[in-house]
C-alpha cells in the first residue's frame, strides 16, 4: 500500500505532498521524507525533484515553501524559517551534485536568509515566520534553532560559502536554552 501511495505522489517531475488538496510541492514535507525515499530506492526521483525545484526557485529568484505544478513559487501561509534548511538537507542526503549556477544561487539565498532570520550573533530573530505548525506563532522555537543548525551542517558538508555560523553554535544553544532535564 505504501509503495502505491509513493508511486501516486510522483508526478513525473516532482513528488507532490498529497493526493488531495495539497497536490503540489511543499519543501518542508519533501524535506521530512527525502532521506527515506532515497533509502527506499527512489533516489532518481528525489534528484529529479530537486533539479525541478531548483530550476523554479532560480527562475523566481527565491526559495519558497511551495511550488505548484506549473512552476509558480509561493510561500504559504507566509515565509518560513525552515524552507532553506530543508532544501539543503535534501541536497545533502540525496547526494545531489550542485552545478556552479545552483551553488551561486544557494549562496545568494544563504546571504538573504542570514539577513532576514538571524541577528548579528547568529541567533534566530524574534520575528513572525511560518514553521512546522503554520497556524501557530512561535518565538524562536527549538525546531527553528535545530533546523538552522542542520542548515549549518549541510552548508559545511556541501562546501557552500556565505553562512558564517557553525553547527556547534546551535547545538550549544539547544542545550543551554531549551534543554530542561
Regions found by a protein language model. Name each.
Residues 2-13, 58-64, 121-128:
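Active-site-adjacent bridging/hinge elements
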Residues 62-66, 121-130, 137-181:
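Catalytic cores of carbohydrate-active enzymes
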Residues 23-120, 145, 149:
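Aromatic-rich carbohydrate-recognition surfaces in CAZymes
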Residues 1-2, 102, 109, 170:
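Alpha-helical structural motif
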Residues 1-9, 37, 91-98, 151-162:
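Alpha-helix C-terminal capping segments
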Amino acid at each position: 500500500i505504501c509503495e502505491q501511495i509513493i508511486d501516486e505522489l510522483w508526478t513525473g517531475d516532482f513528488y507532490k505532498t498529497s493526493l488531495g488538496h495539497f497536490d503540489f510541492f511543499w519543501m518542508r514535507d519533501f524535506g521530512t521524507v527525502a532521506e527515506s525515499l532515497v533509502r527506499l530506492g527512489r533516489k532518481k526521483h528525489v534528484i529529479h525533484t530537486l533539479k525541478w525545484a531548483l530550476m523554479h526557485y532560480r527562475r523566481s529568484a527565491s526559495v519558497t515553501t511551495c511550488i505548484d505544478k506549473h512552476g509558480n513559487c509561493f510561500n504559504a501561509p507566509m515565509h518560513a524559517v525552515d524552507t532553506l534548511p530543508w532544501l539543503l538537507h535534501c541536497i545533502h542526503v540525496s547526494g545531489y551534485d550542485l552545478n556552479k549556477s545552483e551553488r551561486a544561487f544557494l549562496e545568494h539565498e544563504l546571504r538573504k536568509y542570514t539577513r532576514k532570520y538571524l541577528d548579528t550573533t547568529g541567533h534566530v530573530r524574534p520575528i513572525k515566520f511560518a514553521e512546522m505548525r503554520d497556524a501557530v506563532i512561535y518565538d524562536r522555537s527549538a525546531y527553528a534553532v535545530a533546523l538552522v543548525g542542520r542548515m549549518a551542517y549541510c552548508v559545511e558538508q556541501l562546501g557552500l560559502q556565505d553562512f558564517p555560523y557553525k553547527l556547534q553554535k546551535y547545538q550549544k544553544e539547544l542545550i543551554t536554552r531549551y534543554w530542561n532535564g
